[in-house]
């Protein structure tokens, strides 16, 4: 699913960057300036003094924070933003960013004594490499430093690449570094999509799939409807599905296609009224402008990664005109 440029890309490499400093920002910007590409890339200090990348390609713009390797913006020229960001989001060390694309590993949901949704979304990732094709596609590669926070799991290595062009391509690789232990792994790209009105969209591609309904204490159900519509809180873990999912937004005249590989689960979530009011980093009315369609492997689809083996989760997000 990853795009292969027709000409060899150029790279801005060097030592990994994992924390903001004047020296590191200056050095990376100096390396980037030497790349021959129609795209523009700037490394700078963002909100909360968190380091971030701003990317502009011939097709689109994007923003990525090192904190969580978190994509907070992707917008095709002439189109509405693809990703939703809460106006109440925190930008601070140790807190997740609300919106965009949080990375969830090695567990999904809440675990007693461990917290919510793993460690990756609240950690500073290392910036490993930036590559630009001569046509303008930009690929940024990150790695997650080892942490004692995940000491209840066998040691693992995580790498993440983001390719920005006419589409947004994501690849999350997790390798079990243990020589003798299996790594139980839940992974998820918890993507928040911007929509005109959550009650007006339809989500297709999951008819006939079984799911766990978290709103009803994980009741097991089968989706018999042609499409999902949002009219109350929705929190569903769809299982054993590799299907492409589409978000149809008639008011924006847009369809978003979520293509994936290495994923057997799709999560669909909208917090609706009451849960929105309980979340301190989410606006009371913001549920009207977003829906999460998340790709990964969760619950019954938890992966068992053999010693020294790896899993690769890939997602491509495609935005096009509705009916085109």
Language-model region placement:
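Beta-strand-rich recognition/accessory modules
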Residues: 2-58, 67, 77, 142-151, ...
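N-terminal onset of structured domains
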Residues: 48, 55-58, 156, 161-165, ...
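Acidic-aromatic substrate-binding/catalytic surfaces of carbohydrate-active enzymes
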Residues: 58-116
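Asparagine-centered strand-capping/turn motif at beta-strand->loop junctions
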Residues: 64, 172-178, 319
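Extended, loop-rich substrate-binding clefts of extracytoplasmic carbohydrate-active enzymes
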Residues: 114-165
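Hydrophobic core residues within well-ordered beta-strands of beta-rich domains
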Residues: 158, 168-170, 311
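Beta-rich strand-turn-strand
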Residues: 164-169, 178
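Active-site/ligand-binding surface loops and adjacent short beta/alpha elements
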Residues: 180-267
């Amino acid at each position: 699913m990853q795009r292969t440029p027709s000409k060899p890309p150029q790279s801005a490499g060097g030592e990994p960057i994992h924390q903001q400093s004047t020296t590191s920002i200056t050095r990376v910007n100096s390396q980037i300036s030497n790349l021959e590409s129609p795209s523009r890339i700037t490394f700078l200090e963002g909100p909360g003094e968190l380091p971030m990348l701003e990317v502009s390609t011939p097709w689109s713009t994007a923003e990525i924070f090192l904190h969580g390797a978190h994509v907070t913006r992707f917008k095709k020229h002439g189109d509405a933003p693809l990703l939703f960001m809460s106006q109440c989001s925190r930008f601070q060390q140790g807190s997740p960013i609300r919106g965009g694309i949080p990375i969830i590993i090695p567990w999904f949901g809440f675990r007693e004594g461990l917290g919510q949704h793993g460690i990756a979304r609240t950690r500073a990732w290392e910036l490993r490499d930036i590559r630009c094709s001569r046509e303008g596609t930009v690929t940024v590669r990150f790695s997650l430093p080892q942490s004692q926070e995940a000491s209840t799991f066998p040691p693992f290595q995580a790498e993440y690449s983001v390719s920005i062009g006419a589409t947004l391509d994501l690849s999350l690789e997790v390798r079990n570094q243990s020589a003798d232990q299996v790594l139980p792994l839940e992974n998820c790209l918890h993507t928040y999509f911007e929509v005109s009105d959550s009650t007006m969209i339809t989500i297709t591609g999951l008819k006939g799939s079984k799911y766990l309904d978290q709103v009803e204490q994980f009741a097991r159900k089968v989706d018999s409807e042609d499409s999902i519509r949002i009219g109350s809180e929705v929190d569903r873990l769809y299982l054993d599905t590799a299907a492409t999912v589409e978000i149809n937004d008639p008011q924006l005249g847009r369809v978003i296609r979520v293509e994936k590989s290495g994923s057997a689960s799709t999560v669909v979530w909208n917090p609706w009224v009451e849960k929105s009011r309980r979340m301190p980093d989410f606006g009371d009315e913001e549920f009207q402008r977003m829906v999460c369609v998340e790709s990964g492997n969760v619950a019954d689809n938890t992966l068992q990664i053999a010693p020294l083996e790896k899993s690769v989760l890939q997602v491509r997000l495609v935005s096009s005109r509705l009916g085109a």
